Amino acid sequence: MSNEVLTQTKERMEKAVAAYSRELASVRAGRANPSLLDKVTVEYYGAQTPLNQLSSINVPEARMLVVTPYDKTAIGDIEKAILKADLGVTPTSDGTIIRIAIPALTEERRKELVKVVKKYAEEAKVAVRNVRRDSNDDLKKLEKNGDITEDELRASSEDVQKLTDEYVSKIDSVTKDKEKEIMEV
């Protein structure tokens, strides 16, 4: 019984860390990366459509993204959506493709991005701790129902805490790497 709870705990904590990693991918670190545009949605035929479903996104140079729309009539809408996403970039179009020059980050902007990364890290840690709380509640219910003994409850709770510590340290490690990447000039 308690093994099922531990398995679910591990899966949910893994998902929380994976979600955090995806969130970090959208934080710009001076180099062009197609994931920068992952959250951009375009008003296309009356529906909000992710940009990566309407176009291909390439990186021809270290500080340049090229968006090639599958439907050339959507270029204006795509440009507006990129501007509206407030990514700190300005798209330029030649009628068939959209070029996005990634400006070098200023020291001030780097520090702002580090704060954003730390905020995301804290949210991810809270998510992991919420999983811990839910798992401990589930274990207590099992013990109350007589499915596990008090000793098994204590041992399982310690295992849940070890998992929590492991995933929080993973978050810290990923955060440290991202901060280093951002502060790199």
Curated annotation (Swiss-Prot):
GO terms for biological process: translational termination. InterPro entries: Ribosome_recyc_fac (IPR002661), Ribosome_recyc_fac_dom (IPR023584), RRF_sf (IPR036191). Its main location: cytoplasm. The keyword Transmembrane helix does not apply. Gene3D superfamilies: 3.30.1360.40, Ribosome-recycling factor. Residues 136-155 are annotated as: Disordered. One of its GO terms (molecular function) is ribosomal large subunit binding. It is found in: Cytoplasm. It comes from the Bacteria. Keywords: Cytoplasm, Protein biosynthesis. PANTHER family: MITOCHONDRIAL RIBOSOME RECYCLING FACTOR PSEUDO 1, RIBOSOME RECYCLING FACTOR. Belongs to the RRF family. Responsible for the release of ribosomes from messenger RNA at the termination of protein biosynthesis. May increase the efficiency of translation by recycling ribosomes from one round of translation to another. This is Ribosome-recycling factor. It comes from Bacillus velezensis (strain DSM 23117 / BGSC 10A6 / LMG 26770 / FZB42) (Bacillus amyloliquefaciens subsp. plantarum).
